[in-house]
UniProtKB/Swiss-Prot annotation:
This is Nigerythrin. Gene3D superfamilies: 1.20.1260.10, 2.20.28.10. Homodimer. May possess two rubredoxin-like centers and two hemerythrin-like binuclear-iron centers per dimer. SUPFAM superfamilies: Ferritin-like, Rubredoxin-like. The lineage of its organism: Bacteria, Pseudomonadati, Thermodesulfobacteriota, Desulfovibrionia, Desulfovibrionales. Fe cation 3 binds at C174, C177, C189, C192. It is found in: Cytoplasm. The keyword Electron transport applies.
Length: 202
């Protein structure tokens, strides 16, 4: 993802359209925030399990990618939970059962499929509803999550294609929006403009 002149938003970017055959059940913005938290919670658990499996199968770099992405999902959960807590004090985050993990290549495809769904279906639908309700905070949070998820999908597909040809590159996680950069050739987050020296390396 290239750094733009301004932070990308639904107003200045053209990749916020929603798929025609949407599988997302859209409710109120509060309900959508809760649904997003549930989805991100499941993703965090899944990627944590996938990281463990990748390491056991000898894919150290891919294990670090799964760990970075699991941490990114925690960032999204925190942002979404903060909004829910404002709207519904006392709300408790959901829990999920420990997921299964499979061969590393299949885990990467599973991860990519989930990230593509969130990028092309779930978050665009939630952004649209938040706009209708005039909830600018939710639009902001959903937008940053959507943009980060598209990069997560890209990272998973690249790792899948190069599974037998790993390199030594580290993954760098933005602490604000969950963007993940591979390698050292960047100065700031292209989504929220956070400087490189605040990122966490995996």
């Amino acid at each position: 993802m290239k750094v733009r002149a301004q932070v990308p938003t639904v107003k200045n970017a053209t990749n916020f359209n929603m798929v025609a055959d949407s599988k997302t059940a859209v409710g109120s913005t509060l309900e959508n925030l809760k649904a997003a938290i549930a989805g991100e919670t499941g993703a965090h658990a899944k990627y944590t399990a996938f990281a463990k499996a990748a390491r056991e199968q000898g894919y150290e770099q891919i294990a670090r990618l799964f760990e970075a992405t699991a941490a990114a999902e925690l960032i999204h959960i925190g942002l979404e939970y903060a909004l829910v807590a404002e709207m519904e004090p006392g709300y408790e985050k959901p829990t999920v059962a420990a997921p299964s993990a499979y061969s590393c290549d299949l885990n990467l495809i599973s991860g990519a499929n989930g990230e593509i769904y969130e990028t092309s279906d779930m978050y665009p639908a939630f952004i649209r509803k938040a706009q209708e309700e005039g909830n600018s905070k939710a639009v902001h949070v959903f937008t940053r999550a959507k943009l980060a998820e598209s990069v997560h999908a890209e990272r998973y597909l690249a790792a899948y294609n190069d599974i037998d040809a790993p390199d030594d590159d580290k993954f760098h996680l933005c602490p604000i929006c969950g963007y993940i950069h591979k390698g050292e050739d960047f100065e700031k987050c292209p989504i929220c403009f956070r400087p490189k020296d605040t990122f966490t390396a995996y």
